[in-house]
Amino acid sequence: VAKLYNMLEGDAGTTSMGRTAVDNETVRTVYVIRPDKRIGLFLTYPMTTGRNFGEILRAIDSMQRTAKHKIATPADWKPGEKVIIVPKVTNDEAKKIYPDGWETIKPYLRKVPDPHK
């Protein structure tokens, strides 16, 4: 996959044999490819820092929810926690989508339960 997306030099070979960590440094970037073949997220880690798979999975959970619902996820959000109704959704439209209502923090910040529960 790294070769397919040109993350390694063209002459890097077809296997990892003979390559060092320095040769593979460009693969320190994590890409999440959406179903439409576009990059949905990329995170680049220094060679000295391990990847945080919990964060990668959290971001994927967020992207899946926000693709299906008119929501956004707040900072430090975890699956199952409240989400934000995107500002472009009017209150009238929100009443149809969320008949049980929502918590209003600011006019542009309305929270509802995670629809994926």
Regions from the PLM with identified roles:
Residues 1-117:
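Chalcogenol-based redox active-site neighborhoods
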